[in-house]
Regions:
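Catalytic cores of alpha/beta
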Residues: 1-11
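Catalytic-loop motifs flanking and including active-site residues across diverse enzymes
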Residues: 2, 26-32, 122, 126
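Short hydrophobic/aromatic-rich motifs at helix boundaries and adjacent loops
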Residues: 5-6, 30, 97-101
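Glycine-rich phosphate-binding active-site loops on the catalytic face of alpha/beta enzymes
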Residues: 9-26
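Conserved, mostly hydrophobic/aromatic
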Residues: 10, 33, 130
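Generic signal for short, ordered secondary-structure residues
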Residues: 12, 38, 108-109
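C-terminal helical cap(s) of enzyme catalytic domains, especially alpha/beta-barrels
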Residues: 22-48, 52
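A mid-to-C-terminal "edge-of-domain" accessory segment
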Residues: 42-179
Length: 179
């Protein structure tokens, strides 16, 4: 915040580091700083923001310092959507991703939003996953049963479910619909 404010107040030179890595603490992360200057103040630094995620992964790999999956701008799970209400929102906004997200994923080299399945998932989350497997005619009670199992297994696992786990649940609930 101090670095962004310094530029807003006229500073022409600032020091930042990729992912904020460096000696001690308090280094301004380049990605967050550049993106804030661009989106909040309209200041184009000339830095290619589409490389941010790639560079952050490279720096994490070379430095051995792992970055949190939920790290702002470059986190691997930044565009994962687990919450059922947000999954519904993402489904309904189409290409207008600036409604549920502060910036488009391609601006920082991220992939498009991905609906994931976990304890916070909702009916639309399950319906989206079913649709991805060609099941578009599931009844509400079937989706509810699948959702209950998704939530239970996610809580037991303490994490998100993968495609194999989801299909296992679907086979149990609606066995005649999955190969």
């Amino acid at each position: 915040a101090n670095t962004v404010l310094a530029v807003a107040e006229g500073a022409s030179v600032i020091q930042t580091t990729v992912s904020g890595l460096g000696e001690r603490a308090g280094n301004a992360p380049m990605e967050e700083t550049v993106l804030a200057l661009l989106t909040m103040y309209g200041i184009d630094t000339g830095i290619d923001t589409t490389k941010f995620t790639e560079i952050a992964r490279l720096v994490a790999d070379v430095s051995g310092v792992t970055q949190p999956a939920n790290r702002p701008v470059t986190g691997d799970m930044l565009y994962n959507v687990e919450s059922g209400i947000i999954a519904t929102w993402v489904k309904n906004v189409g290409d207008e991703l600036l409604e549920p997200f502060p910036f488009r994923p391609e601006l920082v080299g991220q992939a498009d939003p991905k609906i994931v399945l976990g304890k916070g998932s909702g009916l639309d989350s399950v319906a989206i996953w079913l649709g991805a497997h060609g099941i578009n005619d599931a009844e509400t009670k079937e989706i509810e049963a699948i959702l209950a199992e998704v939530k239970g297994r996610s809580l037991a696992k303490k994490g998100l479910l993968d495609d194999d786990e989801f299909l296992e649940i679907v086979r149990e609930v609606i066995p005649d619909r999955v190969d």
